[in-house]
Curated annotation (Swiss-Prot):
Subunit structure: Homotetramer.
Annotated SUPFAM superfamilies: Chorismate synthase, AroC
Family of the protein in this entry: Belongs to the chorismate synthase family.
Binding site for FMN: 125-127, 237-238, 277, 292-296, 318
Purpose: This reaction introduces a second double bond into the aromatic ring system.
Example GO molecular function: chorismate synthase activity
Cofactor note: Reduced FMN (FMNH(2)).
Gene: aroC
Name the record gives this protein: Chorismate synthase
Pathway(s) where this gene product acts: Metabolic intermediate biosynthesis; chorismate biosynthesis; chorismate from D-erythrose 4-phosphate and phosphoenolpyruvate: step 7/7
Pfam families hit by this protein: Chorismate_synt (PF01264)
């Protein structure tokens, strides 16, 4: 299987299946001398790990990461960083009844046709369990980006039909939904409780923001910063759409509204989401991603078996009724990996570029 590596200078390679013995990652290209501890990685892993609230899967995985290489006496050496997370709470028997069936809207059918072999336990390689390694790798990138003045944060901006207005970053880490509006949390909880009673699932919208990014990141034409961000975010399980800045709303905007006018005091708006011509503008980089509702539910759904016979599928096991609830740290990680890669690429080619034009902020 190809396609397990992301990045050009800062690269992340992952391996492992949902019910295998462990997940692993190789993170290559991190500059030497960065102070790095297990706690730096574990902090974000704890934000993503399952079983932390009644609104997520009850699979109990501690997601304790081990650093196998690339760090010595608390600092990165410049060598490849090896990471490992052991799986400890697999219940593979939950999936024995569907080993010859295809769950609707899952990767079972497409993996079967592509490889002729598949690990049906918990989705195998296609499971969102894989994203634990992305979060661990992204934590390394986030730690380095902080030294460059770049902060990446995310939040849930919609759950099902409930839109969540942004009020404050202070509340995002104080609830299971990563909601920036504390007043919305009771409504979100009630909605999820009813959803579970209905034996159904729902999608979500996540917003992720990078602040402190200087102008100049991004390689125009095929490696545009927004194109690579979209690539990274679309690679997350269940993501079906990505917007940068105003996104699809730009269709109804006139040019006089959409253009982000410049003044000596700063930009007057940020419809471009901090990226112009594929290159960072110095404004906050803003991306939104839409995650579909998981089809791993106990309500019967029509499908076929490996012989083409019609069947009804009921998926047992422990599943997230809304995969978006745990997606915020994953989105942050993928944005961090992209920005880290482009920061190193820009440093390699343009480290000596100096212009007299001031860097504008946003009014």
């Amino acid at each position: 299987m190809s396609g397990n590596t992301f990045g050009k200078l800062f690269t992340v390679t992952t391996a492992g299946e949902s019910h295998g013995p462990a997940l692993v990652a190789i993170v290559d290209g991190c500059p030497p001398g960065l102070e790095l501890s297990l706690e730096d990685l574990q902090r974000d892993l704890d934000r993503r790990k399952p079983g932390t609230s009644r609104h997520t899967t009850q699979r109990q995985e501690p997601d304790e990461v081990e650093i196998l290489s690339g760090v010595f006496e608390g600092r990165t050496t410049g060598c490849a960083i090896g990471l490992l997370i052991r799986n400890t709470d697999q219940k593979s028997k939950d999936y024995s009844a569907i080993k010859d069936l295809f769950r609707p809207a899952h990767a079972d059918y497409t993996y079967h046709h592509k490889y002729g072999e598949r690990d049906y336990r918990g989705g195998g390689r296609s499971s969102a369990r894989e994203t634990a390694m992305r979060v661990a790798a992204g934590a390394i990138a986030k730690k380095y980006l902080v030294t460059q003045g770049i902060i990446i944060r995310g939040y849930m901006s919609q759950l099902g039909p409930i839109e969540i207005p942004f009020k404050t970053w202070d509340s995002v880490e104080d609830n299971a939904f990563f909601s920036p509006d504390p007043d919305k949390v009771p409504e979100l909880e009630a909605y999820m409780d009813q959803l579970r009673r209905d034996q159904d699932s729902v999608g979500a919208r996540i917003t992720v923001v990078a602040e402190g990014v200087k102008p100049g990141l991004g390689e125009p034409i095929f490696d545009r910063l927004d194109a690579e961000l979209a690539h990274a975010l679309m690679s997350i399980n269940a993501v079906k759409g990505v917007e940068i800045g105003a996104g699809f709303a730009c269709v109804s905007q006139r040019g006089t509204e959409h253009r982000d006018e410049l003044t000596p005091e700063g930009f007057l708006s940020n419809n471009a989401g901090g990226i112009l011509g594929g290159i960072s503008s110095g404004q906050p980089i803003v991306a939104h991603l839409a995650l579909k509702a998981t089809s791993s539910i106990t309500t019967p759904g029509r499908s076929i078996d490996v012989h083409g016979n019609p069947v009804d599928v009921i998926t047992k096991g422990r599943h997230d009724p809304c995969v978006g609830i745990r997606a915020t740290p994953i989105a942050e990680a993928m944005m961090a990996i992209v920005l880290m890669d482009h920061l190193l690429r820009n440093r390699g080619q343009n480290a000596n570029v100096r212009v007299s034009t001031p860097v504008l902020g946003q009014l």
